[in-house]
Amino acid sequence: MSTPADKKIKTWQRAGAVVLALSVWQAASWTVDSALLLPGPVTVLGRLCALAVTAAFRRAVAFSFCRIAGGFALALVLAFVLALAAGRWPVVEVLLRPYVLAIKAVPVASFIILALIWMRTSALPLFISFLMVFPILYTNVLAGLRSADGQLLEMARAFRVPWRRQLHSILLPAVEPFLLAGCAAALGMSWKAGVAAEVIGVVAGSLGERLYDAKIYLQTADLLAWTAVIVALSALFERLVLALLRRGFRRLERGCGT
């Protein structure tokens, strides 16, 4: 168990790593000596502050966040439901396997181009973020269900324990580490895929459109500023979702213990 001193050391180490990275960036910017090729961190920070106070910035953040978060939430719910069904009825897994394998194998760019034919561009980030993270969440939840203690499940069936009670007391605790690991991998992927869809589809009012415009007009500082915004949103969203899931599992454990 880490002590307060250990935590303080880790905090200083992280801060030192950030300072080192910024120093390397600034040194590279001085070496290149071209704001077009590589603006320094101070220049990018200035552009970020200038963009952050505009209404267009807030609209773009809200637009992309709602759609990418919505796609992830939809994938999480559907993956959980279908994994439960596949765990209970093996035929469901057999029927779903070709689709899951296809989604894993097909390049995201192919899905984006197809989706541009099928739907409005405003729905593109939601659909692509959903599609890219669904297989990760589904396979992880299914693996968690299969890791549940078989003897406990047999005993529960022998004593005719209701399935809902089996779910709360046996299956969900087994799923927890697999689901958290899957979410940790899928959350970043949802933002990468969603923003890539926005850039390729030039989705109006999105963060991806801002990246595209910055590239077209050779505004490298703006490009890096918008990239920093996307990274920050992805990190905050990941921490929020994982914290909510952990809290939900803790409440479930307390409920099962009473």
What do these predicted regions represent?
Residues F127-L131, W163-A196, A225:
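Transmembrane alpha-helices
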Residues T3, T31-A73:
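Periplasmic/extracellular loop-to-transmembrane helix junction in inner-membrane transport proteins
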Residues K8-V32:
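N-terminal signal-anchor transmembrane alpha helix
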Residues G70-V100:
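Transmembrane-helix boundary motif in ABC transporter permease subunits
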Residues L101-I136, A143-G144:
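Generic hydrophobic transmembrane alpha-helix motif, especially the helices
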Residues I117, L145, A193-I230, E253-T258:
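Glycine-rich helix-loop "coupling/hinge" segments at transmembrane-helix boundaries
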Residues N140-L179, L211:
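Short cytoplasmic-facing helical segments at TM-TM junctions of multi-pass membrane proteins
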Residues P90, A181, L224-T258:
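C-terminal transmembrane helix and the adjacent membrane-cytosol boundary/short C-terminal tail
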